[in-house]
Amino acid sequence: MYDVIIVGAGASGCFLALTLKYKNPNLKVALIEKNDKLGKKLLITGNGRCNLGNTNIMMDSYNSSSSLNSFISQLKENDYLNYLKNFGILTKKEDTSTRLYPYSNQAITVCKSFERSLEKEKVNVIYNYDVKDVTYKNDYFVINNNLRGKKVVIATGGKTYPKTGSTGMGYNILKSFGHTITKLYPSLTYLKTDYKYIKDLQGVRTDVVAKLNVNDKTILTEKGQIQFTKDSLSGICIFNLSRYVSKYLEKDKKVDVVVDLVPDYDESYINNYLKEFDSYNVSDAISCILNKKVADVITKNLKLSKIRA
């Protein structure tokens, strides 16, 4: 019989298991994981570098209707950094960024630190264990008819990246115990587009200002790098817009993403610039400012290829 069984050996599951043992070393804690190693999703965060957090935490960074003010007010950066040091994890921030990364720049460092700490604190980590059923009887929980615990914590994460094990199974378990699951929307993801020339832009990366327009009204603006793929828009600024798109599409709203490819110059400046090079082919003139692929698509889209600037 375990005092606590934690389902899911991701970041939250590992943190919880270690925190419980730090507070009470005598607790019998089990951490169960369906994969053959912990932190599988953690390994791919930050493009393999591991996102450890952000020091600029504010209420408007969250999309929940619940008030998190009391929770956020208790968060102290130094406390968190010292907490990570307990596991042997040193951190860094890049230039003016508020994002935290391991000093090694490798997510595997964080996972290995978790493994060593869990072993040191005598947490029983059970790998390749797929939870099918959780029941409650006789004042304790039973998992798959063979694991028993006084408390069970579901730390399985959401439904993103199912190849890492996040299939949404935890939601079903929670529902079976009467919990309410809020509606889920895709977030931090690319946006598919029906723009007819998108394939011609594949591979292009450039800094832009991207606006999310709903029924022709701008509701959100993001600045950053955009990446064009064969059928979609990607990049941090698009990821930040993505969480709102599904909500409005679900309401049958007209949703457009408008991209300013030259955000550092206004329209009149660009017009005057093009006039100064009126002997150029339009595509050549625009390609002095933008990626050649982008210039070609603009002139093709506007049917300007053979017209002088």
Outline where the language-model segments fall.
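An anion/pyrophosphate-binding glycine-rich loop and adjacent beta-alpha core
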Residues: L52, N56, L90, T180-K183, ...
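A conserved short coil-to-beta-strand element within the FAD-binding core of flavoproteins
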Residues: Y127-Y140
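Short hydrophobic core segments
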Residues: I5-V7, I32, V131, L147-S166, ...
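Short loop/edge segments at beta-strand edges and connector loops
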Residues: V125-Y129, K183-Y185
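Glycine-rich active-site loop/strand segments that organize a redox cofactor
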Residues: G46-T96
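Short beta-strand to alpha-helix junction loop
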Residues: L68-K76, S97-R116, Y161-S166, K196, ...
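N-terminal Rossmann-like FAD-binding beta1-loop-alpha1 element of flavoenzymes
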Residues: Y2-L31
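Glycine-rich FAD pyrophosphate-binding loop
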Residues: K21-N47
